Amino acid sequence: MKSIMMAVALIATASTIKAQTNSDRISVGVGALYERGLDMTISYEHETKYHNAWEYFANGYIKWDECQSCGHVCPDSFWRNYRSYGFGIAYKPCVSRGRNHHGNLRIGASGGSDTKNFLGGAHFGYEHNYTLPRGWKLYWQVKSDIMIKGEDLFRTGVVLGVKLPVK
């Protein structure tokens, strides 16, 4: 019995431990942005050492306005006012760690279009992740986007989302 316990201890100390290093996730996030904006992001995230990550994302944005005829937000003034989309990349260095949670800065760039012009974007923000069983993560994100040639120069807001493991 003593030799079996010694063998188990030797195997346990000799093997390498990887705690979510080099893991990949698909994430979906939805949020509200100032002023009168909704944002949806679908992304693929590759996590490297120490919870640093690279994110490749597709983003859609809608800005609604009040209807000219009725003075309320109606389907036409919501869906057909201003829309844009973009594709980009973001680097997310980890700045805080704890048990089952970590926080990352989010620094990135994107390119896309509204219904008329090409848009370029610079993205800055903070993202906090909470790890759930089976590799799932919940996250909230404070984002600030600078959009070049867009209707909004600055977009800022909060996004809530979920990340699902790929492997």
Regions found by a protein language model. Give the residues of each.
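A generic structural micro-environment signature
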Residues: 7, 34-36, 138, 150
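Short glycine/proline- and aromatic-enriched beta-strand/turn motifs that initiate or cap beta-hairpins
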Residues: 19-64, 157, 163-167
